[in-house]
């Protein structure tokens, strides 16, 4: 057929080795091999396959080495075998020590940003998985060698295995192997990242917009964190009410910081206020921010996904820097409304005032989808602080 090709190798001793390569759906490739023993003695054969590539990482798109998603995404081999569902081994690791392990089933992959190529040996056979550096050209290879099979004279043996070469779409990977979807690596916060993507994907299936999916997931995260955030916002309100009394203590004790601190702590205890709770909303958001970042740089579905007007790709920076400016303005407004704890060092206070600018410049080169999430978080904060 037009989607398959067969290669036949005829050996001088009368043996033949044929391989049929067929293109399946969802970037699947099927391999069917047959070996006929034309000799007069029994022979042993071991099916094998491997993937070669260099260790060079190409960074493309807008941004630099620190903010371009492809610069942070993992590039290198990964394996799945008995006792280990997902094992990343960097090029430097397998250069130092060749990787070898025996398993039944499993898979091997070469992973890069958004894409991967995987080999899946015959899942009913025992195989040796390998990863090493090739001395002849400096490239790296990962492969498998299945268990040796004996072929009697005048008989043949068949074997099948498969491969995947395409984008890291979880649905496709799960169809290939139950554990291949782990190649979409959300880092150590995968237990947050995976549910975030699941909800985003569910919303996108309903409304066909990844941008609005980010907006709605942000709202859901805010609702989820609201009980704890409410405690912090209520505490901030009490802190604002205490500002006149705190200023009075500052004027009364002047340079006697020890006495002033003692009286402030007594006042906080009396009024049941905890100044440290002012950091709680930011601390609660931190793991979700990091998980969101990894979801955005790992999710191929967001590649070239537009949102509104000028945002043509949520996976790269905002080309007009409008979202970073909105984020900067929201951070500055939140800073104005949030009460500053009494007794703060003047130098620290001045540095704190520049934080919106520092973070605004930093996030200007991060993916637009991430800055959209941050902007929504920061825009919602001043409203709550006012209440």
Describe the function of each predicted region:
Residues 208-209, 362-371:
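Transmembrane helix interruption/hinge and helix-loop junction motifs
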Residues 1-182:
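Soluble non-transmembrane domains of integral membrane proteins
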Residues 335-347:
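Alpha-helical transmembrane segments
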Residues 213, 265-293:
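Transmembrane alpha-helical segments and their cytosolic interface motifs
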Residues 164-213, 305-319:
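Interfacial loop/helix-cap signal at membrane boundaries in integral membrane proteins
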Residues 377-387:
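Single conserved hydrophobic/aromatic residue that forms the stacking wall/gate
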Residues 185-244, 250, 280-284, 288:
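Core alpha-helical transmembrane segments of integral membrane proteins
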Residues 216-220, 224, 284, 322, ...:
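Lipid-exposed faces of alpha-helical membrane segments in multi-pass integral membrane proteins
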């Amino acid at each position: 057929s037009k989607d398959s090709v067969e290669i036949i190798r005829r050996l001088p001793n009368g043996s033949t080795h044929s391989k049929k390569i067929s293109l399946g759906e969802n970037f699947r490739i099927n391999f069917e091999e047959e070996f006929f023993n034309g000799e007069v003695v029994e022979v042993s054969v071991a099916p094998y396959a491997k993937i070669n590539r260099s260790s060079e990482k190409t960074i493309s798109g807008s941004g630099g080495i620190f903010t371009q998603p492809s610069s942070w995404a993992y590039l290198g081999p990964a394996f799945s075998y008995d006792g280990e569902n997902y094992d990343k081994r960097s090029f430097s690791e397998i250069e130092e020590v060749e990787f070898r392990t025996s398993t039944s089933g499993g898979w091997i992959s070469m992973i890069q940003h958004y894409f991967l190529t995987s080999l899946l040996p015959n899942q009913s056979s025992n195989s040796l998985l390998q990863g090493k550096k090739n001395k002849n050209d400096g490239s790296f290879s990962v492969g498998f060698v299945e268990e040796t099979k004996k072929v009697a004279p005048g008989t043949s043996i068949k074997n099948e295995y498969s491969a995947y070469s395409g984008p890291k779409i979880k649905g496709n990977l799960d169809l290939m192997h139950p554990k291949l979807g782990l190649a979409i690596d959300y880092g150590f916060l995968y237990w947050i990242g995976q549910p975030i993507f699941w909800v985003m994907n569910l919303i996108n299936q309903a409304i066909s917009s990844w941008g609005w999916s980010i907006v709605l997931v942000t709202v859901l995260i805010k609702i989820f964190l609201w009980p704890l955030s409410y405690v912090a916002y209520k505490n901030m309100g009490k802190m604002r009410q205490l500002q006149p009394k705190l200023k009075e203590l500052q004027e009364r004790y002047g340079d006697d910081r020890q006495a002033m601190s003692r009286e402030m702590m007594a006042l906080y205890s009396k009024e049941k206020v905890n100044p440290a709770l002012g950091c709680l909303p930011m601390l609660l958001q931190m793991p979700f921010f990091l998980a969101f970042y990894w979801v955005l740089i790992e999710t191929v579905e967001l590649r070239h996904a537009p949102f509104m007007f000028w945002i043509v790709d949520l996976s790269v920076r905002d080309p007009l820097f409008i979202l970073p400016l909105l984020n900067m303005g929201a951070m500055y407004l939140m800073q104005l409304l949030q009460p500053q704890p009494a007794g703060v060092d003047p130098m620290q206070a001045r540095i704190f005032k520049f934080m919106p600018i520092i973070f605004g410049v930093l996030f200007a080169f991060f993916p637009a989808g991430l800055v959209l999430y941050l902007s929504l978080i920061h825009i919602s904060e001043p409203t709550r602080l006012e209440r």
